[in-house]
Amino acid sequence: MHERYVPADVEAAAQSDWRAADAYRSKEDANRKKFYCVSMLPYPSGKLHMGHVRNYTINDVMYRYLRMNGYNTLMPMGWDAFGMPAENAAMANGVPPAQWTYENIAYMKKQMQSMGLAIDWSREVTTCKPDYYKWNQWLFLKMLEKGVAYKKTGTVNWDPVDQTVLANEQVIDGRGWRSGALVEKREIPMYYMRITQYADELLNDLDGLGWPERVKVMQHNWIGKSFGVNFGFPYELDGEKKLLRVFTTRADTIMGVTFCAIAAEHPLAARLARDKPALQAFIDECKRGGVAEADIATMEKKGVATGFSVSHPLTGEPVEVWIGNYVLMSYGEGAVMGVPAHDERDFAFAKKYGLPIRQVIAVEGETYSTDAWQEWYGDKTRAVCVNSGKYDGLAHDAAVDAIAAELKAGGLGDKQITYRLRDWGISRQRYWGTPIPIIHCPSCGDVPVPEQDLPVVLPEDLVPDGTGNPLAKSDAFLNCTCPKCGAAAKRETDTMDTFVDSAWYFSRYAAPDAQTMVDARTDYWMPMDQYIGGIEHAILHLLYSRFWAKVMRDLGLVAFGEPAKNLLTQGMVLNETFYREDAAGKKTWYNPADVTVSFDDKGRPVGAVLKSDGQPVELGGIEKMSKSKNNGVDPQMLIDHYGADTARLFTMFAAPPEQQLEWSGAGVDGASRFLRRVWAFGFANREALAVRAPFDAAQLAEADKTLRREIHGVLKQADFDYQRLQYNTVVSAAMKMLNAIEGAKGATPAVLRETYGVLLRVLYPVVPHVTFELWKALGYADEFGPLLDAPWPKVDEAALEQAEIELVLQVNGKVRGALKVAKDASREAIEAAAVADGMFAKFAEGRPAKKIIVVPGRLVNVVV
């Protein structure tokens, strides 16, 4: 054992032992309680960031603590390796996405290994490898057979210059991110998965999950179950009688309809624009720009009158039809009723275009005005109908029931339950993804690839150039024969949404070498006992993975319908930001490592200069670590300088896992100093700590009893904190333990050995390298086995008992000191001790005690 703690040497030695022992390989064991903990698999972007370090350390701490408590634990890892960033990097660097991806995986895996993570690498999954995505294709075909997957036209962003489909995030201010061309909306055939078929189950099953309430609410709102009325506005066109159908949750306001708005893609819009160039021009304008719902919500609401009217379903009055850029064909019926008096968006639209505003609900004590929108205008809890004929005076629910009944009687509509959730469009007009296993035959149409021909392998040597899908230009991939008739045919060139890859990888971890998609091992490990990842995945990934599990269950592949029992969404890692702004308002951001900050006498930052030129930079505040703000900390530099254990200790100590973590260089230094103290005590007392003499706890001297009482008391709290995932207070407990052990005067070697061994085991899940090496060097491994599988220390409840207790001494209700009495002292003995105490004499100033109040175990108050 070396005198000086050298993290690089300590960590290399520990990791060497773990590799030699294949320490983290997990096996199924029906006789043991399992614990399966998974961090969301990373995208191989090139390097780990501090968010990764925090996430994986939380997972690792959980794994090690539960393994010490006898659980059969599994912590796997993989790579979410398909996706657009690899294509962008390929275009920038002129290399195939596969090369860029595999190089990044190799480096990031090395970084993870340097962190000492308890990963079972034998279960590693890489989603861009054929042995994985084969099962994406296989399940897609099964879903196609069952009608859970299907084909229909969908709207996409089309770049007319690059001749390619753009993702929503590639559309910036309505233009393509590379070409700058105005983006168009196009309708193309795409494959969808019928997630709406599972909407109610996805909603109802949220109640049984140990997930953060915030995530449940987000999913609940995303699914968006609505109870309303679907009805039609009658009209006649080209000699045909039709209905313009809409859905509303506010049928009680139907008498306030003054216009209808339809989507630019609505069939009625195309018909009405035939001989109206201005209308067609507006439709074309609407078809340019992004198709994301978020974009629609924030953009300027515009519309054009069509000059055509439909009939109000209850009054028969004409209702003008407008085309609105805010109406989505993919939501509802592609048409909405306009009630400006009681819908904020409609109110603004009507004010902009001078449309009538007709009040049809009222709230007692409120006065309606068309001058400005007021929140109560849309209130349905207090509102009653007015200006609505026979419905006047009805509250919301009664009005909806009555109006729905009248619409139904007239054959115009009925009550309906709808969902905000839409079927999942999985087709992506991109190269780097799972090929969709469909062959297009001129004679047979769309033909599924036979199961024996799976996987359809994605060529890995193509380099995208930004102009169209490389697969469509690859004859080797594109050209094939029809499995049905043998004629020349073409492969589907669309690939699957990368959320498909991440929808089930945790099930494959359980059986990575299975010759089927999953096997019995999957039902042993799944569902995950703990899933860990960022709140940004609350909706899409987590919702799709829940859907995928239910589909797999219904196909008889697995026994579970939910992938994760518990979810932890770790907080973001924050850091200071610094910048300079030029005359044009452009900001240049500087990394905190390149800046010197000055502080006031209260430790608050008051100024900063750039180290390279000594000139001032602006303080930008504390924000999430990001490339855009250049305020990240390179984990590798941190590990190289301080060691992985210091990085792990700081990230666990600085904040509870679910809260934001503010980066602190001083905090990292403090973590490093603490580990050096742990090592220094072990080295300085190595001879005493080697003593394995048994002892009778009841016969120990007071110094030994005091130390054991403190250590076992803190151990009890640390164990509780581990169970509730409050790892920051676990570290605090370890610090208290070290302080107590260092400060123990007169403790015997045997008790020092016991208590220091408790400290090492409490710290081990957080800092496994240094504790593993100290455990071995000081002979604990010879007694208990390697720290990897050493049992969690048991609290000695007898050690917590005290012969004496300390009570707060008060005089006239004010704290004046402390009083030590026997634990079983009678009330009379406590009263006598209180009036005999010197502090009572000092503050009573000769006055006798009138009354003595004793609160057992807590305080004694003498009233004079």
From Swiss-Prot:
Top-level EC class: ligase
Keyword Cytoplasm applies: yes
Subcellular location: Cytoplasm
Main location per the UniProt record: cytoplasm
Residues that, per the record, bind ATP: K627
Motif 'HIGH' region boundaries: 42-52
Annotated catalysed reactions: tRNA(Leu) + L-leucine + ATP = L-leucyl-tRNA(Leu) + AMP + diphosphate
Gene Ontology biological process terms in this record: leucyl-tRNA aminoacylation
Gene Ontology CC terms: cytosol
Assigned protein family: Belongs to the class-I aminoacyl-tRNA synthetase family.
Name the record gives this protein: Leucine--tRNA ligase
Organism: Burkholderia pseudomallei (strain K96243)
Lineage: Bacteria, Pseudomonadati, Pseudomonadota, Betaproteobacteria, Burkholderiales
